[in-house]
Amino acid sequence: ADPAEDPGTGLWTLISGTGNIIDPTSPTTAIEGLSIGENVFQWTLDYSTCGVQQDIVSIVVYDSSSLPANAGADQELCSPTETTLLDAQGVNTPAIGTWTLISGSGQIADANNPNTEVTNLTIGENIFVWTVYNGECLAVEDRTDTVSVFVFNELQPAADAGLDQELCTPNQSTSLEGNNALFPAIG
């Protein structure tokens, strides 16, 4: 060996989480017993007189038993209400769920809270998507779900069924003439 080279020594250490390092001095060792969540390890190269070099690696283990994204039931509101709570199914740590507005309007208070408040909804359909990131543990089609919050216009005209009618037999048919509802009411 060249006396000018300092071969140094390497050592793996567990910083956080769990894990059994099979050969702590091997740069390419196996690790067993990792816990769900983040597990952080440090690789230290000690070159004695030439100093110490360190780097960390994070290994995140996701829970494969996590359920697919579920944004909750569609909602119907009547103006002037412009606020509601979204009701997605929560996720198991370290998975992350995120709300996004995809059409309509609404301001999401906390995008990562499954039961967040949404304000500034407008009349009509407002669609939100709940996206779950759980590493590669969920199939692509199970990572998102949408919910519709439909706000009806309270300022609708009163129902008007039209004029009363009187008929004489044999005429036993006529037409009903009610007024129209304004969008987005049903009538």
Q: What do these predicted ranges mean?
A:
Residues 1-5, 81-92, 171-183:
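A short beta-strand segment in extracellular, disulfide-stabilized domains
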Residues 5-14, 92-101, 182-187:
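Solvent-exposed loop segments of extracellular immunoglobulin-like
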Residues 9-26, 100-113:
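Low-complexity "stalk/linker" and mucin-like segments enriched in Ser/Thr/Pro/Ala/Gly
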Residues 26-40, 113-127:
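Solvent-exposed segments in extracellular or luminal domains encompassing
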Residues 45-51, 133-140:
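Short, solvent-exposed loop/turn segments at the edges of extracellular beta-sandwich modules
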Residues 53-62, 141-152:
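C-terminal edge beta-strand
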Residues 65-73, 155-163:
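Proline-enriched interdomain boundary motifs that mark the N-terminal boundary
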